[in-house]
């Protein structure tokens, strides 16, 4: 569960290392986001020479969450960290590589490019 002021690791090579959640998209009073949801973030830490810079406001999709998500068969999938991938408005990633595993729930939300770039889909 990601909410405002949550800090997430960035799991791509867009140049950002860490982002801070500003807003959860999808409804006027929505408070929390989970895997597959799009959030608005501010870049808090970035590598020099990257596509995004520190202080940029970007959209990101959550790919890993500590709280995890329940699947239809009753199982839960949880990760060791909260991580996101920076995306454009058309849901395509800004980076060209994805680091670490991503959840299968991204396929249901039409983030196929992220799923295809990921080294492992759990």
Swiss-Prot record:
PROSITE patterns: RIBOSOMAL_L14
Any one GO MF annotation of this record: large ribosomal subunit rRNA binding
One Gene Ontology CC term in the entry: cytosolic large ribosomal subunit
Matching Gene3D superfamilies: Ribosomal protein L14
Matches recorded under InterPro entries: Ribosomal_uL14, Ribosomal_uL14_bac-type, Ribosomal_uL14_CS, Ribosomal_uL14_sf
Listed GO biological process terms: translation
Keyword check for Transferase: no
Keywords in alphabetical order: Ribonucleoprotein, Ribosomal protein, RNA-binding, rRNA-binding
Signal peptide segment: none
Record flagged with keyword Ribosomal protein: yes
Assembly mode: Part of the 50S ribosomal subunit. Forms a cluster with proteins L3 and L19. In the 70S ribosome, L14 and L19 interact and together make contacts with the 16S rRNA in bridges B5 and B8.
Family membership noted in the UniProt record: Belongs to the universal ribosomal protein uL14 family.
Function: Binds to 23S rRNA. Forms part of two intersubunit bridges in the 70S ribosome.
Protein name (Swiss-Prot/TrEMBL): Large ribosomal subunit protein uL14
Gene source species: Shouchella clausii (strain KSM-K16)
Underlying gene: rplN
């Amino acid at each position: 569960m990601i909410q405002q002021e949550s800090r997430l690791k960035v799991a791509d090579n867009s140049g950002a290392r860490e982002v801070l959640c500003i807003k959860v998209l999808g409804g006027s009073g929505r408070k929390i986001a989970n895997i597959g949801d799009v959030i608005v973030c501010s870049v808090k830490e970035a590598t020099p020479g990257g596509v995004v810079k520190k202080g940029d406001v970007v959209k990101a999709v959550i790919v890993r969450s500590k709280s995890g998500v329940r699947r239809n068969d009753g199982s839960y999938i949880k990760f060791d960290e909260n991580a996101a991938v920076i995306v454009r408005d058309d849901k395509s990633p800004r980076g060209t590589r994805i680091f670490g595993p991503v959840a299968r729930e991204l396929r249901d939300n039409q983030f196929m490019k992220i799923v295809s770039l990921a080294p492992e889909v759990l």
